[in-house]
Amino acid sequence: MHLADLIETTLSGMGYELVELERAPAGLLRVYIDQPETGIAIEDCEKVSRQLTHVFTVENVDYERLEVSSPGLDRPLKKLADFVRFAGAEARVTLRLPVNGQKNFTGILREPTGAAGEEKIGLEFEGKDGPALLEFAVSDVDKARLVPVIDFKGNQRKGNKQ
């Protein structure tokens, strides 16, 4: 079984989702997790770390050190479900190919539209001539991350459907 599949299977059984997996030099394995309903606390990271350590031992996964973390305020958006979940939130999107000479966009995500398998994600942004709407498929995205919103009054992130 592929490492990402092994981790994803383990996490889903625990009620978490795999956001990103990173293999760094010197045997470091970084696993970013999330729990859509509640977010991630340090206790969640500890619990997942213990479970993955056991799974890796049984499956003979080669690594030196394991780090389990939340994805942070600037969470990466990788799957269609991420774009659905964070519709209404501000995001930075880098496309694989330029649109009108531009690859980098920052704006408000809109609910995906279109038939299954052909969904288009909308991003409202401030263009040269005023407000504009960019539509793209997940496969068109090189990188996408939420723009961090820090609310010192304790309110949740705007647009987060949690």
Swiss-Prot record:
It comes from Cupriavidus taiwanensis (strain DSM 17343 / BCRC 17206 / CCUG 44338 / CIP 107171 / LMG 19424 / R1) (Ralstonia taiwanensis (strain LMG 19424)). Gene3D superfamilies: Ribosome maturation factor RimP, C-terminal domain, RimP-like superfamily, N-terminal. It comes from the Bacteria. Required for maturation of 30S ribosomal subunits. The keyword Cytoplasm applies. HAMAP family: RimP (MF_01077). NCBIfam families: PRK00092.2-1. PANTHER family: RIBOSOME MATURATION FACTOR RIMP (PTHR33867:SF1). InterPro entries: Ribosome_maturation_RimP, RimP_C, RimP_C_sf, RimP_N, RimP_N_sf. The lineage of its organism: Bacteria, Pseudomonadati, Pseudomonadota, Betaproteobacteria, Burkholderiales. It is found in: Cytoplasm. This is Ribosome maturation factor RimP. CDD domains: YlxS_C. The gene is rimP.
